[in-house]
Design a protein with these regions (language model features):
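Extracytoplasmic/secreted cell-surface and envelope-processing proteins
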Residues: 101-105, 127-131, 135, 191, ...
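Short, surface-exposed basic-aromatic patches at helix termini and helix-loop junctions that form
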Residues: 107-116, 234-235, 258-261, 282-284
């Protein structure tokens, strides 16, 4: 069993291989272009070298980081899947929420004959600003998957408290399956979130159990979501590994939730971010705060005997 947190730059992609052999992918990002927020932060952090490069027409890529003195190798999630799981379908693709940095390159799955069997989505009527052809292609593929012509893939819009065969139940109804628990969204608060216009708070917050390792995947959930989880779960919010919400930004950090979760490892997908970076706050509650940008791909493996390891692509 394995959970891989891929170094995809600004965005997310988590690939989980369950004991059943089924494959879950949570979000995908195969775009090497920086979004506006990250672009501004890179300029601030690296100064003139990045700022001058960013003025070149069409240059908004992670090549900026190399030019500014940071050597980084991003992982193409499509190539990762083809190399590590050749010929294998994605049994369960979960779109945490409908922001482009969590779905860029989605159309490349179909282009490389990687089929999605079940497509998890959230209820919304959000449409992002589409500023380039790559964004348009990814969004159009997302809409195609949501429509699910002829039932392929099967579209599921789950919420807190739901149960179902394969993801948290065995075919005979016994609890288990692939060990996925939905902590959020909650149907009681979904309308309020939709009305607020804060798409980040539509995020699936999932607790996935691999062997006995409890992993919380928090999407881009912000304070209001964490308030609800703290109120509803209390000390039952415990986990071993947390994938930090909103790429480790302050907006996704919640002090009481961290105290209750008390993870051994916190994984941040992006890395150090001036002004908005909450890594120092996470370290108050977790000794091991690992960024994919500095550590590369981060992989948790475990087996039925209870043996577990967590390793990174780069030892730094």
């Amino acid at each position: 069993m394995r959970a891989s947190f891929l170094n995809v730059g600004h965005g997310d992609c988590t690939v989980i291989e369950h004991a059943s052999g089924r494959l879950t992918v949570v979000d995908v990002n195969n775009c090497l272009e920086l979004d506006d927020e990250t672009l501004a932060e890179v300029r601030e952090y690296y100064g003139d070298s990045a700022s001058k490069l960013a003025e070149v027409p069409g240059v908004r890529t992670f090549g900026m980081l190399k030019e500014a003195g940071y050597n980084i190798e991003l992982t193409n999630p499509i190539e990762f899947l083809r190399k590590n799981y050749p010929g294998k379908d994605i049994f369960r693709y979960i779109q945490s929420h409908p922001h482009l940095d969590h779905m860029n390159g989605l159309e490349q799955l179909k282009a490389h004959n990687i089929e999605i069997v079940n497509f998890w989505d959230t209820e919304h009527d959000f449409t992002p600003e589409l500023t380039n052809d790559a964004d348009l292609a990814s969004w159009n593929e997302y809409k195609r998957l949501r429509r699910s012509v002829n039932g392929s893939p099967k579209v599921l819009r789950h919420s807190y408290g739901a149960s179902g065969t394969f993801w948290n139940q065995e075919p005979d109804g016994v609890k288990g399956g692939d060990g996925i628990e939905i902590l959020h969204p909650n149907r009681l608060t979904l309308k309020k979130i939709q009305d607020s216009g804060n798409v980040n708070n539509l995020s699936y917050v999932l607790r996935v159990i691999l062997c006995e390792v409890k992993i919380i995947l928090a999407g881009d959930a912000e304070k209001e979501v964490w308030d609800d989880l703290v109120s509803g779960y209390g000390d039952k919010l415990k986990c071993d590994v947390l994938k930090a919400s909103h790429h480790g930004r302050d907006s996704g950090f919640h002090e009481k939730a961290m105290e209750l979760m008390n993870p051994q490892f916190t994984i941040v997908s992006v890395g150090r971010k001036p002004e908005t970076d909450a890594s120092g706050r996470y370290r108050k509650y977790c000794k091991n705060v690992w960024s994919t940008r500095w550590k590369g791909n981060i992989v948790i493996t475990c087996d039925v005997s209870g043996h577990r390891t967590i390793k990174s692509q780069y030892d730094r």
